[in-house]
Each structure stands twice: as structure tokens, then as C-alpha cells.
Regions:
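Long, low-complexity, intrinsically disordered polar/charged segments
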Residues: 1-10, 66-86
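Conserved pre-motif I regulatory segment
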Residues: 2-53
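Conserved nucleic-acid-binding Ia/Ib motif block in the N-terminal RecA-like helicase ATPase lobe
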Residues: 14, 19-30, 76-136
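Short aromatic/basic micro-patch
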Residues: 35, 63, 131
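Walker A/P-loop NTP-binding motif
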Residues: 38-50, 60-76, 87-90, 94-99
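Short alpha-helix boundary/capping motifs
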Residues: 53, 69, 127-129
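The conserved Walker
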Residues: 54-58
Length: 136
């Protein structure tokens, strides 16, 4: 008989993700990585360049955000995520802001159509990750 029980985020364990991030994945309900996550996370975690294509809603943001956050936790530097639209920037920021604080990082969003003063204040806090659109 095969044991079908799983440990928290068991499917993510073999991908080299830090324990705090694994715990967060489990708490947020992510139990099994999607195909794009299975393929992308190990490659991105090694710091390699890649291109990933997948349908909307398949977890592409987690596929690049988790390795980026983990890399930044291990060394100095900053992360920049440039996306083409304000809406996508806000979506990416929502995901990044769920995970980055777990490893002591802040993220900021810099987009058009929002208060420049508020965005400037966020940047003065020296976030490690900036999510932005090219227009700003």
C-alpha cells in the first residue's frame, strides 16, 4: 500500500526552498508545486537566466519570487521586478509582500497613477525589492 499522506508543502521540499518560505507556502495553501514552479524554482535558485511560459493562474510569480527572495537573503543587493502594467505590478507586489518579510526584507511598488510622495516614502525605507513599471 502506498502512503498518500503528505507533510506540509511536501511537494516544494525537493526544490531547495528555505524552511521559513516552505512554512509560508503551506500556510498560504500551496501544497503541490505547479509544473512551472517545479521547473523554474530550481533553475532560478541557482541564479541562472531563464524564460518561463505558462497560463494565467499557474503560479509564475511564486516561481520567480521565492528564488529571488532566497538569493537576496543570502547576499547583499537588491531585486528589481519590471512589469509592463500597473495591475501586474500590484499583483506581483501582493505575492512578494507575503514572502519577503519572512526573511527580513521589505518590498516597494513604484508605478504611475499613484501618489509620488507615498512611493518616495516607501523608497526612503530602503526596500530590498522594488516592483515597478518602466514609466516611473
Amino acid at each position: 500500500m502506498t502512503d498518500t499522506t503528505t507533510t506540509p508543502a511536501a511537494g516544494f521540499y525537493g526544490l531547495g526552498i528555505a524552511p521559513k518560505l516552505l512554512e509560508a507556502l503551506d500556510k498560504l495553501g500551496f501544497k503541490v508545486p505547479t509544473p512551472i514552479q517545479q521547473k523554474a524554482i530550481p533553475v532560478a535558485a541557482e541564479g541562472k537566466d531563464m524564460v518561463g511560459i505558462a497560463q494565467t493562474g499557474t503560479g509564475k510569480t511564486i516561481a520567480f519570487a521565492i528564488p529571488m527572495i532566497q538569493q537576496l537573503a543570502a547576499k547583499e543587493g537588491k531585486g528589481l521586478v519590471l512589469v509592463p502594467t500597473r495591475e501586474l505590478a500590484l499583483q506581483v507586489a501582493e505575492v512578494v509582500k507575503q514572502f519577503a518579510p519572512l526573511l527580513g526584507m521589505q518590498a516597494a511598488v513604484v508605478i504611475g497613477g499613484e501618489s509620488l510622495g507615498r512611493q518616495r516614502q516607501e523608497l526612503f525605507r530602503r526596500p530590498r525589492i522594488i516592483i515597478a513599471t518602466p514609466g516611473r
